[in-house]
């Protein structure tokens, strides 16, 4: 599983300029099964994505994100193996 941390590198007006395209890309990625959760950081300095796809598919998808393409955010991809989860989240366990 992967946690992807996005950190904005540009002023918020530039983030907002690219936001609609980013949201459209994000919806497509959800439809393709790349991500299982996404949201903004509080305070609004970036966002977090959660993915259970393979690394090659993840990297290919991230390369299409308008925030990446236009240099709006930097991306940190962190892999981890879940070995304990709350009830109802068994699908997140690594086998």
Indicate residue ranges for each PLM-predicted region.
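Conserved, structured core segments of small domains
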Residues: 1-95
């Amino acid at each position: 599983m992967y946690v992807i941390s996005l950190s904005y590198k540009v002023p918020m007006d530039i983030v907002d300029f690219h936001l609609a395209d980013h949201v459209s890309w994000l919806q497509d990625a959800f439809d393709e099964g790349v991500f299982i959760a996404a949201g903004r950081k509080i305070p609004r300095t970036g966002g977090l994505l959660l993915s259970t796809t393979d690394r090659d598919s993840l990297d290919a998808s991230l390369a299409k994100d308008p925030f990446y393409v236009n240099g709006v955010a930097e991306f940190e991809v962190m892999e981890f193996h879940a070995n304990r989860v709350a009830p109802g989240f068994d699908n997140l366990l690594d086998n």
